[in-house]
């Protein structure tokens, strides 16, 4: 993980999981050794604790508003993040909206939710979830928990027309915008 406190950014190394260029997932980025490590579009080399601490060091404020009880009715809060993805040979750094397809065409609203205690208890390795989540360090305020798997309100997958092949290494940069 690379932290640039002056520019309020955190950059991490990830690997593309090509399965989710065709299959749906609610898992954006997960630590490769977590129990959900192979369920995400991007497999990361950073732990939830390291990622949480890096976002705080970069100036982020965790929302800490998500619980197991309120998750299906609550939208995650916390510092707003612009997320971009780059890799060797990429035409440019692509925004998260460009690399992740939302079946409803809605924009992602990525927030530093926090949730370090739950993350350490559950050991899923979840870093970035595509709906509001009480475990992931960062998640998407556009949808509440259960929107993908339980209620079928939306489907997410990687944008195969933009992203490189399975196993390609990439960097993901999180910029704190508010």
Give the positions of each predicted feature:
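Long, low-hydrophobicity ectodomains and other hydrophilic envelope-associated domains
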Residues: 1-178
